[in-house]
C-alpha cells in the first residue's frame, strides 16, 4: 500500500529505531480513531461507507494486490499454474479435510513439483539452527518520524474499514456491529504500539486472509487465533523459517492469483447483494472513479506525504457519496 511505501521511505531517513517510534504514533492515532467511531456510532460509519462505496473498495483491495501475485508467478509460470490448479481442484473436488485446505494443498503440490525439478535449494534449511529467535530492533524516539507518520495513518485506517466490510461479506456476519469497528480498530492500534515498542514489524489487516476464508468457508475466529499462536511458535524454529523461505515465489504467486481474485469477486458480490443500481448515474460515477483512481495509480502528494491506492480511492468515494445529489427517480 502507499502507507507502507511511505514507511519504508522514512526508514531510510530516520533509521529503523526512529521509525519504530513513528509506529507507536500510528497505533495511538488508531486508538483515537476507535474512540471517535465509538462516540459517533455505527450509523455514522455506514453513512460514510454505504454499499456503493464499500463494494468497489473491496474490489480494489483485490485488484490492487493482483500485480504482486502476477510478478511472483511470472518467475516460473508452469510452476505457478501447477500450484494454482492444485488449489482449484482441492477447493472444488476435494472431500472432507482436503476441501478445507485448498491453499495448503496448492503450496504442497507446487513445492513438491519444484523439488522434483531441482528448483529448491535445501542447503539453507540444513544449515539453519533448530532454534533461532527473531531479531528485534531497540526503538528510539524520533519526533520527525512521529510527526510524519501521524497523517500516514489515514490510509491504513480506511483500508482497515474496507477489510472489515470485506470479511463481513465473506462470513455473513456483521463485525462492524459485533464486536464493533471501534474494537477491531483499537486492536489494530494496540498491535502497532506493541510492535513499535519491541522493535518488530508493523501490523495491519491482512486482505489475503479474506480470500482464504472465502475459499475454505471456515469462519470461526478461533481458527485465526490458532493460526496466530502457531505462527508465533514456528517463528522460533530456525529450520521451519528456512523451509518456508525456500518455497519458490512462483508457487506463492500462483496461490495469490486465486486469493486476490476471490477478494475482488467478494466486492462484486457485495454490489449485487445490496442491489446497487449502476443504472443510476450517481452510483455509476462513484464506482467508476473509485476503481479508475485506484487501479490507475493516482496519487496526491503534499508536505512529503503521499496519499494513493486504496486510501485515496476510498476517501474519494466517501467525498463523492456526500456531495453528489441523490437521484429522485432511481433507488
Predicted regions mapped to residue ranges:
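Helix-loop-helix hairpins and the membrane-proximal interhelical loops
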Residues: 103-182
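Short, small-residue-biased leader/transition segments that mark boundaries at the very start
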Residues: 1-8
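Juxtamembrane loop-helix boundary motifs flanking transmembrane segments in multi-pass membrane proteins
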Residues: 37, 58, 81, 129, ...
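Membrane-embedded helical hairpins/re-entrant loop segments and their flanking transmembrane helices
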Residues: 151-221
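Interfacial segments of multi-pass membrane proteins
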Residues: 9-12, 91, 209-224, 230-234
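Membrane-embedded alpha-helical modules
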Residues: 17, 21-124, 228-331
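Hydrophobic alpha-helical interface/terminus motif in multipass membrane transporters
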Residues: 10, 45, 66, 167, ...
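Membrane-interfacial loop-to-helix junctions in multi-pass transporters
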Residues: 51-54, 78, 138-146, 175-184, ...
